[in-house]
Curated annotation (Swiss-Prot):
Coiled coil: none annotated. Signal peptide: none annotated. Disulfide bonds: none annotated. Residues 2-48 form the F-box domain. It comes from Arabidopsis thaliana (Mouse-ear cress). It comes from the Eukaryota. This is F-box protein At1g10895.
């Protein structure tokens, strides 16, 4: 009689590709062979899929997104994370397979979660958190994980983790010194990357971007697996074009970076609107030479989280997939949906499993 352990690797791989990442603990317990294959498949066989996490109604959900070679988009698989069912989360940060969860309406603790091992750990600070606190999680050269906490009283700060260090998109801040905003030329405000080195526990020098962005232009960061950093810039709409660029790092260190262009597309004939860096994120598929941008659609009647698939071939490939309706975050009693800047970013960075024990 054939048992589960007798199935060949191809059949097991097919089962694994249909298994939510948050259910792998059950799969790994079937037998030693399945446990070994699950690690091999996750760490070496997931190049064709995007794995990530998204927020829906203050709940953390896993997201599996397939993009086939013919650019046909499979419906995304979205599963609420059962281990976090009783917790309302306001934001999530990702670092090398670990997720840092900011708890909604709770200033006394944070939660670190390893989805692959299904382990959680509560972190309590010496002093209570503040509503303006920003966070990042990373590790030093000895793989000791640390949490960075700081305050920014202007805008939410976006960051991505690469090589254990955290990279921020930043702009030079002007001090008006009695002058009105109309008297200040902000078109030449310097923008750059900043790296927080978790080994040295300090910020490095300003790192150059491959472009100069202006006010109201969209700039957002992402990682290409564990190997490269990528940055998206969508230019301010101007006749006759609306250019979107994505650059990928060819070399990156805490004190140096170099770039190469990955994608450059005129978005005006494709979408007719500008992505919002406060509401979404993106990842790239280097084999198919496409980018997938997660954002909120531009309608004020009803808002949906949408995945936009963009390519450069054939004059600009474009497709979109509806992920789900966004809850109405507007003031009670008002008509319409909140502006994108009032909404929670829908998708976290792509996920690579970790064997780090935190429980």
């Amino acid at each position: 009689m054939t048992t589960m352990s007798d199935l060949d690797e191809i059949m097991v791989a097919e089962i694994l590709c249909r298994t939510p990442m948050t259910c792998l603990k059950t799969v790994r317990s079937v037998c030693k062979k399945w446990n070994a294959l699950s690690k091999k498949w996750f760490f070496f066989g997931k190049a064709k899929q995007f794995l990530g996490f998204m927020m829906m109604d203050s709940r953390v959900c896993s997201l599996r997104f397939d993009l086939r070679k013919d650019l046909v988009v499979e419906p995304p698989s979205i599963k609420q994370v059962s281990i976090l069912d009783q917790i309302e989360v306001s934001k999530i940060f990702h670092s090398d397979g670990l997720l840092l969860c900011i708890i909604k309406n709770d200033t006394t603790r944070l939660l670190v979660w390893n989805p692959y091992l299904e382990q959680t750990r509560w972190i309590q600070p010496r002093h209570n958190f503040h509503i303006l606190d920003c966070y990042a999680i990373g590790h030093d050269k000895n793989r000791k994980h640390k949490i960075l906490r700081f305050v920014d009283d202007f805008l939410p700060v976006e960051n991505v983790v690469f090589g254990g260090n955290t990279y921020f998109f930043a702009k030079e801040r002007y001090i008006f010194e009695g002058k009105g905003p109309e008297e200040i030329d902000i078109t030449e405000t310097e923008d750059f990357l900043l790296c927080f080195d978790f080994t040295a526990e300090r910020f490095g020098p300003r790192l150059p971007l491959p472009f100069h962005s202006y006010y109201a232009e969209t700039v957002t960061l992402s990682c290409v697996k564990e190997d490269q950093l990528s940055v998206l810039c969508q230019r301010q709409p101007s006749e006759p074009s609306e250019i979107l660029e994505i650059w990928v790092s060819t070399n990156i260190q805490p004190n140096a970076v170099s770039w190469s262009i990955f994608l450059k597309v005129d978005m005006r004939p494709l979408t007719g609107f500008q992505f919002n860096d406060m509401a979404g994120s993106f990842f790239i598929d280097q084999e198919n030479k496409v980018a997938v941008v997660f954002d909120l659609d531009p309608s004020q009647i009803c808002r949906y989280q949408t995945a936009y698939i963009i390519g450069q071939e054939y004059g600009g490939y474009f497709n979109s997939v509806n992920i789900g309706e966004v809850p109405n975050l507007w003031i009670p009693g008002s008509v319409g949906y909140a502006d994108t800047t009032s909404c929670i970013p829908p998708v976290c960075s792509s996920y690579v499993p970790s064997l780090v024990q935190i429980g």
